[in-house]
A protein has these predicted regions:
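Extracellular/virion structural assembly segments
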Residues: 398, 635-730
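Repeated scaffold domains used in trafficking and secretory/extracellular systems
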Residues: 106-108, 138-155, 185-198, 234-250, ...
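N-terminal beta-propeller domains
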Residues: 2-225, 229, 249-251, 255-277, ...
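Loop/turn-rich, solvent-exposed surfaces of beta-rich toroidal or solenoidal domains
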Residues: 375-408, 430-432, 559
Length: 730
């Protein structure tokens, strides 16, 4: 006799649960039974009463917290997420501003121009910059710069000595130039290197006589180009193609071609090379000295090293058959400048700037990572107080970067930021920097570019035309002409061009028609630039790091407040979104109270934003501008709020729906409870259906509480009761 089929149920009641394991993502569809709610595909009847209400509320989204931030008020107990910054003295170089990351982020920002950030607790405009003397020599094909600025003082005049290829000029604090060496590009050779001991300048060139031999000259700094130089010595059989020289430790050290010489300032005969490098093609670039040693940097191809020469007990550099290699750069990184200051050696390369610690015992050096990667080589350094200025350009425009050796962010990585620069010029490299004598005013210079040979010259009255194949200039360009003709050499504005000719108008008149001499050139000039004595830059800015509050969730950035003194000039507050789009909010200036502003743009929630503060100097008192002391931003989390719902359901073997339809079987209650607890233990997301309203949500089960009660029918085993279920939407 066949037994009863399980689907027949008991007491003619159908099975109310699925056979097998129920999927947590399953949905329930009412058929003959009108269930009220389903969770993970399991249906239940509500057991709602005054004693057991259905509760629905917003899930907590702010955790309990206390204020332990280094910036007061950084934690919010009022619903706002706060971010504030009261100083910028640790420099630029971060992308995200998360102060919890420590000193590598605290008091730093992303970018700035024309802003002095080095006073703790405030930021102000830097000084303005004006153009000075033109430069007419480009960077050499081997990568060497033939511009060099040196701080000098002659008589009562503070200024700089500008070496520019064939010429050397003195420039004072007012920008007035005095020709010091005036070699003719068509008749003389260039100045390959120059140094001074504070009163006299020394330089190396080639004697243009038949032998073309190396020649070292000197001249007191109070002289000018009308004063003849004093030849110190010549070296027969040596023609200079590359050189660097420096006055260190009461002597001149000179590297010419692949040989290194040492001689006193009174030298009158050719010295003997104390070291000859095995590579004839090596390019020596820079010389400096620490307490126990003298260093010379150079590169050959894509390999670059620093060579060390230690002094013996008599204070004499020993003659070496091989130099001591103190440091080697990574392949492809070439050293252009080394500069010893405050116990560190600054290293300028084609990749950027490094610092090395120097042993005061044996002069050994240990260099660190790149402090900053630059868009051009770092050709030069200048120093005052705890700061070092670096000739690197500022975002492709003529200018310098400043490094604070008193603020070490990481091992041998120091705080840095853009410093003074000249806006509106691009495509040139900043090649040198120096202070104007004893002042705190900086000068820097740029290379000339697009230098082309001139093969012919002619002039009718004041209209001059020179021939230069495929020159690439256009009408309106300012050019320099050197070595062509005394009447045509100088700086001119082009009036017209053809593919191979350039026409301009001269200040004198006369007829000229002849082939140009050898070493005649035309090009686009560079300039020297002088920092102003008191006038501030007209505008500047600071852009903060992106603020994301340490989470990737979207936020509503809604409030911004800046603090400072805005009696002079103005400060504009802007938001910068992730795509770099800027949104103006308010301008603080005299007569406008610095109030907290609503930042309604961008209008949508953002994962992160930055803030940009634009400084404008005072229109009347140009030596004054805004003093910015910090900001505070407020945001709220934009993540959709979650809801918790708590409701009771029946869990008995036999149950009746609202239409008195009975369903169930013996053991059903315990089986359903176990299935529900299994889903809870997995922590998975399940489908919740309110079958009375049609609402469907994805939820997680927060809590299940089962209360066992007396079953309505004593025929059953007695297991059953009320389940209190708490869920949270996701």
């Amino acid at each position: 006799m066949a037994g009863r089929d399980i689907t027949e149920g008991r007491a003619n009641q159908a099975i109310a649960v699925d056979v097998g394991i129920v999927s947590t993502s399953a949905y329930w569809q009412n058929t003959s039974d009108s269930y009220d709610v389903a969770l993970g595909g399991q249906p239940f009847f509500y057991a709602i009463s005054d004693a057991r209400p259905y509760i629905r509320q917003t899930a907590p989204y702010n955790k309990d917290k206390f204020d332990n931030s280094p910036e007061p008020g950084e934690q919010s107990l009022t619903g706002w997420w706060l971010r504030s910054q009261s100083s910028f003295h640790s420099g630029s170089g971060i992308k995200f501003y998360d102060p919890s990351a420590g000193e590598t982020v605290s008091h730093r920002f992303t970018d700035s121009k024309n802003v002095n950030v080095w006073t703790k607790g405030q930021a102000t405009l830097l000084k303005d910059v004006a153009t000075g003397h033109v430069t007419t020599y480009p960077v050499e094909s081997n990568g060497r710069s033939f511009q060099q600025l040196r701080s000098i003082k002659w008589g009562s005049n503070d200024g700089v000595l500008l070496h520019d290829g064939y010429d050397v000029d003195k420039i004072d604090t007012t920008g007035v130039e005095t020709h010091f060496i005036d070699y003719n590009a068509g008749a003389d050779d260039k100045v390959y290197a120059i140094c001074d001991d504070g009163t006299t300048a020394y330089w190396v060139t080639n004697d243009t006589g038949p032998s073309g031999k190396l020649e070292v000259n000197k001249k007191v700094l109070t002289a000018d180009s009308t004063t003849s130089a004093t030849p110190m010595f010549t070296i027969n059989g040596v023609t200079v193609t590359n050189a660097t020289m420096e006055y260190v430790k009461d002597r001149i050290v000179m590297a010419a071609n692949n040989k290194i010489y040492e001689f006193p300032t009174s030298q009158a005969t050719a010295p003997t090379a104390l070291y000859t490098h095995s590579d004839d093609d090596i390019i020596f670039t820079s010389i400096t000295a620490s307490g126990p040693a003298i260093y010379i940097a150079g590169y050959s191809g894509i390999q670059s090293s620093i060579f060390k020469f230690t002094l013996n007990t008599a204070g004499v550099m020993p003659t070496l058959t091989s130099a001591i290699t103190a440091a080697e750069m990574p392949v492809g990184e070439k050293i252009h400048k080394i500069y010893y200051y405050l116990g560190y050696m600054m290293i300028g390369t084609n990749k950027g700037i490094r610092a090395a610690v120097v042993s005061d015992q044996d002069g050994s050096i240990n260099y660190g990572p790149l402090i900053v990667e630059t868009t051009q080589p770092c050709y030069d350094f200048a120093a005052r107080d705890r700061f070092v200025w670096c000739a690197t350009s500022v975002a492709g425009e003529p200018g310098v970067i400043r490094i604070d050796l008193g603020n070490e962010i990481e091992t041998l990585r120091f705080a840095y930021a853009n410093d003074i620069y000249y806006t509106g010029v691009s495509g040139v490299e900043t090649t040198s920097c120096a202070f104007l004598g004893e002042t705190d005013r900086l000068a820097f210079c740029t290379e000339a570019i697009n230098q082309k040979s001139v093969t012919n010259k002619e002039r009718t009255t004041t209209t001059a035309t020179i021939t230069s194949a495929a020159h690439g200039f256009v009408a309106g360009d300012v050019i320099y002409v050197i070595g062509v003709d005394a009447a045509l050499d100088g700086n001119w504005t082009i009036t017209s061009v053809t593919t191979n000719t350039i026409t301009f108008t001269t200040t004198t008149s006369g007829t000229i028609a002849s082939t140009a001499v050898t070493n005649a050139f035309v090009g686009k000039p560079g300039y020297s630039y002088l920092e102003a004595a008191s006038t501030l830059a007209s505008t500047g800015y600071i852009t903060t790091g992106y603020i994301r509050y340490g989470t990737l969730e979207p936020k509503n950035f809604k409030r911004l407040l800046a603090r400072g003194d805005f009696s002079y000039g103005s400060l504009i507050l802007e938001t910068v979104d992730k795509d770099g789009v800027e949104y103006d909010h308010i301008t603080y200036e005299a007569g406008v109270t610095a109030v907290e502003v609503t930042t309604s743009s961008p209008s949508t929630a953002q994962e992160y934003v930055a803030y940009k503060f634009v400084f404008n100097r005072d229109a009347t008192t140009t030596s004054q501008g805004p003093v910015f002391k910090g900001y505070q931003a407020k945001a709220t989390i934009a993540t959709p709020r979650q809801r918790t719902m708590q409701f009771p359901v029946y869990c008995f073997d036999i149950e009746t729906d609202r239409y008195n339809v009975v369903s169930g079987y013996e053991g059903k209650a315990f089986a359903r409870l176990q299935l529900l607890e299994d889903v809870e233990e997995n922590g998975d997301v399940v489908a919740w259906q309110d079958l009375t309203t049609g609402e469907n949500r994805q939820v997680v089960i927060e809590e299940i509480s089962f209360t066992r009660m007396t079953p309505p029918d004593k025929r059953f085993d007695g297991f059953g009761g009320i389940i209190e279920i708490t869920i949270r939407t996701v």
